[in-house]
């Protein structure tokens, strides 16, 4: 389709937890729509969307991939999104540009909670969505139980359009609740219409009535028809689904088994008939889709390909032409995408999702336009929860590491990096262990930078518990001018958080003013590595007395004298190790809160309190102080306890004495 119109476009994000079958569903969509000659398989590594070595090696999606197809006189752009929570940034960015999301889930009550963060994001951003219950041929529980569980994680009413037909435990087909037509599945081909099984007539009637009553909550005319026992026409029911889905008021539910292509054609029919076209989502942003006004687009994802930078963008307003300039830059090309295939086109109409080539210094989330316009909203980068200290295998590569890391962060905004000024390490931050492993593999594959990694060092400090007075004298004679410095210092502890203070109470010029900076310099140099091997904080040092020699004294000599005094005096001050304490806020489903409290306590944490989330039913927030030393694998353990959905944010808070039983093991090498 050369120039699709609003009415003939659908932008559909396929989302869901890891292992729910999203990529398999997309492969089935491509197969039954005639878009591929052979259906790919994740195990064989030949799917359209998972083409990167990192995805193939793990048999999981690690970045969003686009597959645009023409089907039934429509242009459908499918965005296959990662399911792992560690790659949620990819999913959220893609959803901002989608018109509809298909939530793929398993027919397994125990896995329903993994959908909760996804439902909340869709609700918060008012993105229309429907549910495809996958793997119905291997359902763990009856359809009704799965549906009830799904309702517990959605703030919108879930309304099934289909009802499954089983023979024993074998999935045979489904009943379309709108038309009341039953169908029998066939692997690899379309389902055939069959007579409605007599034993399901009662269940079908009840399910259909519940569907109509749910729709009637949003349609007074339909409500009147039901009250008067008038059978609503099929077109009216379909129109209600289309209108309420487009307004993000309901969540239609369909079912199938993508591995066998069951339910895929009906899903496509639902997307064609009910999914909103681009004008609906654009209207929410007060944008015009009639072709008037300047071009407005937004970058949903940034790729660095062998051919250069490629920006995945949604055209929100206007028609983009190959000769246009966006944000002052001339386009390097417009491409329609099908996995890693790029097809050049001369124009992209409003609503399309396309690749834009070689737009330099344009980041993910950037609003692009041919005019000066207000930036469109975009999802914020996820805060980091897991870090590694990294370095190139070869020191000669250190120079190009920062450039490569910059590009890595542009591709994935949920990655960040820093040069830690205290430990001198380069720290790469992300969303989990797999997330960072993939990032390191990309550094090696894309930028020829083999890396080594380890847990980041904890920036311990030390302080003192009591004060002392100490004398330091430096005297050195070499023939000719010697060196002489003589100081008396008072060392005292300060309140936590007061850092370092230096003062002097010299009377009568016993230490000339020009030498006092040398004393302070000597003290500061010593405090960079105290008696326990770490920087010293919360300490006050006062120069109280001393003496000098007219010929042999110098600033350098007084610096040495001060160092000698500190070296002698500090061990007398009962030095103690301090560790950084983080302020941590953990988000967890209420049913796991007690486990989370135990986890925090088991990591030497101090629980400050917990409460129900006001913006998220059946979820709690736990506030705590935790030692940084206990946080390296905290996210891994938290997710293990909470079906992968627990999360936390953190920030540095204060320093605290290390318990005596841990301190002896923390001396640096």
UniProtKB/Swiss-Prot annotation:
What SMART domains does the database record attribute to this sequence? EFG_C, EFG_IV
Residue sites binding GTP per the record: 16-23, 80-84, 134-137
Where is the segment annotated G1? 16-23
Residue numbers spanned by region G2 = 59-63
Offer one example of a GO biological process linked to this entry: ribosome disassembly
Question: Where does the record place a coiled coil?
Answer: none
InterPro entries cross-referenced by the UniProt entry = EF-G-like_DII, EFG_II, EFG_III, EFG_III/V, EFG_IV, EFG_V, EFG_V-like, P-loop_NTPase
Q: Which UniProt keywords apply?
A: GTP-binding, Nucleotide-binding
Q: Where is this region: G3?
A: 80-83
Region named G4: 134-137
Report the family membership: Belongs to the TRAFAC class translation factor GTPase superfamily. Classic translation factor GTPase family. EF-G/EF-2 subfamily.
Name listed for the protein in its UniProt record? Elongation factor G-like protein
